[in-house]
Amino acid sequence: MFDQIPTQRPNTPLLDVVDTPARLRELSEKQLPQLAKELREYLLYTVGQTGGHFGAGLGVVELTVALHYVLNTPDDRLVWDVGHQTYPHKILTGRREQMSSIRQLDGLSGFPKRSESEFDTFGVGHSSTSISAALGMALAAEMTDNQQQTVAVIGDGSMTAGMAFEALNHAAHADTNMMVILNDNNMSISKNVGGLANYFSKIWASKTYCALREGSKRVLTKIPQAWELARKTEEHMKGMVSPGTLFEELGFYYVGPIDGHDLERLVHDIRNMLAIPGPKLLHIITQKGKGFTPAEKDPVGYHALNKIEPKASITPISASGGAEAPAASTIKKPKYQTVFGDWLCDLAEVDPFVLGITPAMCDGSGMVEFAERFPDRFHDVAIAEQHAVTLAAGLACEKFKPVVAIYSTFLQRAYDQLVHDVALQNLDVTFAIDRAGLVGEDGPTHAGAFDISFLRCIPKIIIATPSDENECRQLLFSAYHHPGAAAVRYPRGTGPGAVIELENQHWPIGKGRELRQGKTVCFINFGVLLPDAIAVAEANNYGVCDMRWAKPLDKDLLLNMAEQYDYLVTLEENAVAGGAGAGVMELLAAEGISTPVLPLGLPDEYLDHGKRSQLLQAAGLDRASINQRINQWLSRHNGAAHDSQIHSL
């Protein structure tokens, strides 16, 4: 048990020689607990040096060791869900010395990534995909007579998503040889592991019982009534002492729950269960943050850590991915998530019909206070984005006004529900789209790069793109009072520090504003890159418009700017393809206006992980790159170099 993060590299003699799972399998079982201890301490040290996901990895140290010890990875397929818990996996699969680069530009990904290692069988970041992917691999093995084993590791939180149960149902129907390990780390499925349940789970995982069961099955299936009676008897015995009846009903052979930190037991049960043909599920109980006292006491707060600076204390990061707030006296800028949460609470005080809905992102979306103050009007539906959106649609049918707080990347999972269940029926649902744009170290799996593009084509929906904290509050209020589907997109973290007007204002839908008059070029800005547009404009005497809405566009303002200026430059933190800039060009083309437009936004590629500033530079959206791209574009149009320079940025 550790109370502090090691600041010096720990002594890990056993781990130092285990650089691949093959070397791990050369150890005796008696050496595994020592390896797990060293692995846990090394994980504490490396995350302290770099920052990153923390609690989940500590909770699966023993499981990771056991899996790579029993399985013949990478020939056997091991599929992790979400990926927060895979740091121990990376350490044991040849990446120990690269851990200092994790979640940094050109370094290791914080999630499994197929291009990074042959041991990363499936790339993840979103939840609840592991069983489906593993089932595909297992079916492929059957079709090619490959004897490989396939194992999916999924947490109890991810198991709340419908996709996981769809995969379980298919796996059982196909009677596919695969194994699912349910990592239950917050007791949401089973409240306790009693002595009787533990005793029976040992029996059910034993070689003797498994052999007896399979032998009886071969004999009794020839006598349907006898087999059915035996199956029901076994089912009722298990149902009395374990929570596995659901999985047995689906068609899985179930063992558990067992202690997920008991290495000897894990090795024994995994090895025995892999010998059973067909679908099987091992239910283990683990503790998130295991081995580090502060994380065991506060698993949510220690979901991740910031890098530990010299002489600095540990800074936990909540599950939202943001560092915990400093003391009130040092707070200068609120996060956009705080702006949203404050607005929602203020609105709920005066509007009894407003409801808050989120798919397992209460803390990350800034809804903790709303949930505490208005519990009857708050719905955390767990990892069920599709359900969240259609739930909102049903509530809107009964004259309530739901606000769905959802990350941009996760809204992708509920697109059909947004189109079919909300927009098509013109229902009054507001979407507070968090994490729009680049998200830094979490990388492409979590980037909100596409929401303007996939929303803009939906009839009747309106899309707001606030450029600062005050615009975020006022556009949320304006969108909320629009009778129909409305979306407001805003980024992770803090804004420029605009003064927030607490009195809500109705801003006209689809109307922008001209902020700066200039010559030759005018910026048509959508969203939080506005300070960069202004800086470049001031250095070059360009004009600037803050559009506020990506849909509907301010037609009058755009036509006026196209008449006043020789060139327009659209700027957004969304994919160029189908984005707001594309909308501007479509509008001008429809009006027969030939003013050249340079659309600046995220390129047609997946940007890797790194600091937000680094990713903006890689995308050509930092101030220097914006200026350079405009210069190059103008030189092509003018036939000569346009030598304007940025000053005092």
UniProtKB/Swiss-Prot annotation:
Homodimer. It is an enzyme of class 2 (transferase). Catalyzes the acyloin condensation reaction between C atoms 2 and 3 of pyruvate and glyceraldehyde 3-phosphate to yield 1-deoxy-D-xylulose-5-phosphate (DXP). Its EC number is 2.2.1.7. Belongs to the transketolase family. DXPS subfamily. This is 1-deoxy-D-xylulose-5-phosphate synthase. It catalyses: D-glyceraldehyde 3-phosphate + pyruvate + H(+) = 1-deoxy-D-xylulose 5-phosphate + CO2. GO terms for molecular function: 1-deoxy-D-xylulose-5-phosphate synthase activity; magnesium ion binding; thiamine pyrophosphate binding. Mg(2+) binds at residues 156, 185.
